[in-house]
Amino acid sequence: MIQKIFFCTFLCFITFAGYSQQCTYNFKGTITDYHDGTSIFGATIFIKNLNKYITSDNQGKFEIENLCNGKIHLFISHISCETKEVFVTINKNTSKEFSLEHHSEELKEVRISSTSELKMKTTQFTVLKSDVIDAYSSKNLGDVLKNISGVSAINTGNTIVKPMINGLHSSRVILMTNGVRLQDQEWGIEHAPNIDINTAEKITVIKGANALEFGGDAIGGVIVVAPNRIIVKDSLYGKSILTGQTNGQGFSFHSSLSKSTKEGYYVNAKTTVKKYGDFESPGYILTNTGLNSEAFSLQTGLKKFEHGFNVYYTYVKNEIGILKSSHIGNIEDLVNAINSDASMAVKDFSYAINSPKQEVTHQLVKVDFYKRFKKLGKLTVQYDFQNNKRFEFDNRIGENKNKAAIDLNLNSHSLKTSFEFDSKSKQTYKVGLVGAYQNNFANPNTGVKRLIPNYNKYDFGTFVIGNFIINDNSRLDFGIRYDVNYINAKKFYLKSRWNERNYDVDFNDLIIGDFNTQWLVNPEFTYHNMSASIGFFHQLNDENSFQFSYALASRSPNPSELFSDGLHHSAARIELGDLRASQETSNRVAASYDFRNPKTNVSVALFFNHIRNFLYIEPNGIEQTIRGAFPVWNYKATTANLFGVDINWQQKITEHLNFNNKTSFIKGRDASNGRDLIDIPAANTQNTVGYSNKKWHHFNANLESNFVFKQNLFPNNDFEVFIPTTSSNVLLDLSATPSSYHLLNFNTDTTFKVSQKTNLTIGITVTNILNTKYRAYLNRLRYFADDLGRNYLLQLKFKY
C-alpha cells in the first residue's frame, strides 16, 4: 500500500514538473550599429538550439517565441560585419540590444586624416607599399623615399641618407615609426634616421603640416612608417629576404615571422643584418665607407574590436664608416680636396671600419591600449621610451686614439592619449593630449669641447582634428594644435666667444659660474607654438578631382641651432648656434589636380611655403684652432619662400607595357637678403618604361632614366683663405654646385611557387649602368669624392 502511494506521488511530481517546463517565454532583440546606434535591417540571427534562422526588421528588431528555461545560443551576422556569437539566459520574458561593427575588417592601427584608404584626400600624400619596400630591403629609409616625387635626400656619403620633403629636412620633418615619434638627435645633417625599413609594411609621406596629431612642427611634412597589419585569424606566416651586391661586396639579410589567433592575440619578430665593405666610385675605392648594421624588433598584443593592447620593442645598431678623405686636418686640406678630381686618400678594398666613423644604437619601447565606447568612439593611451647613444670618432693619437670625440646619450619619454568621436559616419573628431620629457647627457670625458650641452626638455601639446564628408564628392578636414616647449641647459662658453657674439649684452643673467677662461651658463627658454590646418577635396567627375590645403606650423629651435659651439669633428667644421634663435613660423598653401582613368593617371601638385625666422647654417669664414684652421658655419635666421611643383604621370600603353614619369622642381629664396637659399634640391625628372606579364611567373622588368639638373640657384658663400705653405691667398669655393648628370638603372623580378604556401621571388637590379662619374649637390662629401659607381644586386625573397 505504501509503495502504491509513493508511486502515485512520484507520477504527480513528474506531471507537475512537465507542466512547469512549458516553453512560453519570449525573447526580443534589437540589432544596432555600434558607432551611431542606428537600426540594422536584414541582420541574420541563427538560433543554434532550434536550428532556425530569422532576420531583423526595418527597425532592427526580432523576436523568438515559445522558449524554455535555459540558454539559447545565437549567431548574429550582417554584410560587412564580423559575426557575433552570444549566449542568452532565458528564465522569463527577456529583451536585449546587440551592436554590430560595420567596418571591423578595415580597422587600422593608426588613423590619420590623410591615408591611402581614404578615397577623398585633403592633403598631398603618397604611400609606398610592401613590394617597393622589400625591393629596397638592403637600403635605408632615405633611399626608398626617393621613389616619391618631391622627396629627395641630403647625404653624408651613401650610407647616411636623410629624407628631405620639398626642400626641408631634419627637425622640420617628423618621422613616426609604429605610432612613435622618433627621437634620435635628428637635428644633425649627418644623423640618419635609426629605422630598419624592413619593419614597415607601408610608408606614408604627408607633405606639409597637415597631420597635427603627430606634431605641430612638421614644416616639411611627416613620414609615417607603419608595421604589418594584424590578421585576426589562426595563422603563421613570414618572409626572408637575402640581398647581395657587388659595390661594397656586401649583403643584407632580413627575416620575419608572425603568429596570430582568431581570438585576436598576436606576436611577430623581425631581424635584419647588413655588412658592407668600402664602396666604389667609377674610378677608385671610397676608403673607409663600410657599414655594419643589425636590427631586431618584437611585437605582441591583443586586437579585438572593442579593446586591445600592443607592446613593441625595437633595437637598431649601426657602425658607419666616414670617407677617409673627408677628414681634413686644416683649411689647406679642404682647398686641396676641392681642387682635386679624385679622392685624396685611396687604399685597397677593406671591410675594416676605422676613424672617422659613427657608432649609433637606438632602442624603443612602446605600450599602448585602446578601448571603444558604444555610440561614442575610441580611447587610446600610449607610453613610449627611447634611448639613443651616439659616438662620433675622429682621427686621434695617443691615449685618446680610441675615445669618441662626441659621446651623446639621449633618453626620451612620451605619454599620449586621444579620443576619437566616430559615432557619426559623415563627421568624426579627434582630441588628444601629449606630454614628453627628454634628457641629453654629453659626456665631458671625451677630451674635446662638447658641441651639444647637457639639457632637459619638456613638451606639452593638445590638438583637435575634425573630418567632414560634405557629400558624395566633397570632403573638408581641419585641425588645430597648441604646444609649449621648455628647455633647460647647462653649457660652458669661452669668455672670448661669449663677448664676440655679444651675449654679454643680452644674456649675462644666465651666467652661474666663472671657470677662468670660461663661463658656465644656464639657458632656460620657453616657446609657445600654435599650429592649424584645413583641407578641402572635391571630385569633379569620375576622372577629375582637385585638392586644396593650408597649414600653419610653428617650430621651436632645436638644441643644435641654439647651443652649437665648437668643432664638429665628423663634419670637419666649426658650428656656432645662436641663443637668440626664435620659433620658425610656416604658412604653406598647396593645391593638387588629379586625372585618373583605366589607362592614364596624372597628378600635379603645387605648393608655396612662407617661413618666418627660417633657421639655416652656412659658412662665413675660418677660425684657427690648435688642430689648424677650419671653416666656420653659423646658424642664421631669415624670411624664406619656397615654392615648387611635383608631377606624376602613369600611362598604360598596352596590357603589358607601361610608362611612368616623376618630375620635381623647387625654388628657395632668402627674402630678407634677396638671394637664393642654400641646400635646395636641383630639378630632376625620372622616366621608367616597364613590362609585366603575370602569365610568366609574374614577370616584371623596368628600365629607369634619372636626370638631375645642375643647381644654378645658390648663395655665394665663397671667401679667401691664407695658405701658409705657399704664403698666398686662395679662394675657398664652397658654393659652386656640381654638373648635371644622368643615371640609367634596371631591375627585373619573377616569382615561382615553391610549395602550396611558399613563394620565391628572384630579383636582379643594376644601378648606374653606364658607370657614370657624378657628384650630387646635396651630398656633403661631394667636395672630396665622386658618388657611387655601377652596382649589381641579386635578391632572393621567400614568403611563407
Question: Which role fits each region the language model picked out?
Answer:
Residues T199-E201, L212-G283, T289-F296, K304-H307:
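Outer-membrane beta-barrel translocator/receptor signature
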Residues F607-I611, L615, N620-I622, G628-N716:
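Gram-negative outer-membrane beta-barrel transporters
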Residues T32, T44-F46, S77-C81, N91-D134, ...:
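Short, acidic, small-residue-rich periplasmic hinge/interaction motif at the N-terminus
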Residues S554, I611-N613, I617, F707-T725, ...:
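C-terminal beta-signal and adjacent terminal beta-strands/loops
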Residues Y276, P282, T287-T289, G308-V367, ...:
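Flexible loop and strand-edge segments within Gram-negative outer membrane beta-barrel domains
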